[in-house]
Curated annotation (Swiss-Prot):
This is NADH-quinone oxidoreductase subunit B. Keywords: 4Fe-4S, Cell inner membrane, Cell membrane, Iron, Iron-sulfur, Membrane, Metal-binding, NAD, Quinone, Translocase, Transport, Ubiquinone. Binds 1 [4Fe-4S] cluster. It is a peripheral membrane protein. It is found in: Cell inner membrane. It holds the Pfam family Oxidored_q6. GO terms for molecular function: 4 iron, 4 sulfur cluster binding; iron ion binding; NADH dehydrogenase (ubiquinone) activity; NADH:ubiquinone reductase (non-electrogenic) activity; quinone binding. Its EC number is 7.1.1.-. Belongs to the complex I 20 kDa subunit family. It catalyses: a quinone + NADH + 5 H(+)(in) = a quinol + NAD(+) + 4 H(+)(out). Signal peptide: none annotated. The gene is nuoB. It comes from the Bacteria. Its cofactor is [4Fe-4S] cluster. It comes from Campylobacter hominis (strain ATCC BAA-381 / DSM 21671 / CCUG 45161 / LMG 19568 / NCTC 13146 / CH001A).
Length: 169
């Protein structure tokens, strides 16, 4: 029990608020990201390793979800073929706003070594990408670092309920 009564209010009786609602909402958003793993090739193995006990993605507040309707972050890991492009777009459209996309690996970024008619040469041609992870295949630490960069990006954004969806120009 405290022996002294501390008055945290001003003379008006109103408490002092030292933050903005944007910072509070963005802090909550950045520390509880639910990711949908869209693993297509070798990079998916490294992405699955981030959820294991050695790297422990959960300590950053990120939980992998199987449903697009419960996810805020989409991690595209691997070669995106033209057959998968329509499905990837539908899954992206099913995600609630605000939503972010991480493109993981050279194949997801640029098509990789597969320069054929059946491979999309970069998933940013189908959906807007926020963070690109280079490498073949990127290590789990790289995905964790990308998540921390995404958290910083979310904290800087303006928390607006009437956000316009991201569009490709």
């Amino acid at each position: 029990m405290a022996k002294h009564k501390i008055d945290y209010t001003r003379e008006n009786g109103l408490p002092v608020v030292l933050t903005t609602i944007d910072k509070l909402v963005n802090w909550g958003r950045s520390n509880s990201l639910w990711a949908m793993n869209y693993g297509l090739a070798c990079c998916a193995i490294e992405m699955m390793a981030t959820g294991a006990s050695r790297y422990d993605f959960d300590r950053f507040g990120t939980i992998f979800r199987a449903s697009a309707k419960q996810s805020e972050v989409m991690v595209i890991a691997g070669t995106l073929s033209k057959k998968h492009a329509e499905l990837a777009r539908r899954l992206y459209d099913a995600m609630p706003e605000p939503k972010w996309v991480i493109s993981m690996g050279s194949c997801a970024n640029t098509g990789g070594m597969f320069n054929t008619y059946a491979v999309v040469q970069g998933c940013d041609r189908i959906i807007p990408v926020d963070i690109y992870l280079p490498g073949c295949a990127p290590r789990p630490e790289t995905l964790q670092y990308a998540l921390m960069i995404l958290q910083k990006k979310i904290r800087r954004e303006k928390a607006n309920r009437n956000q316009l969806p991201k569009r490709l120009v």
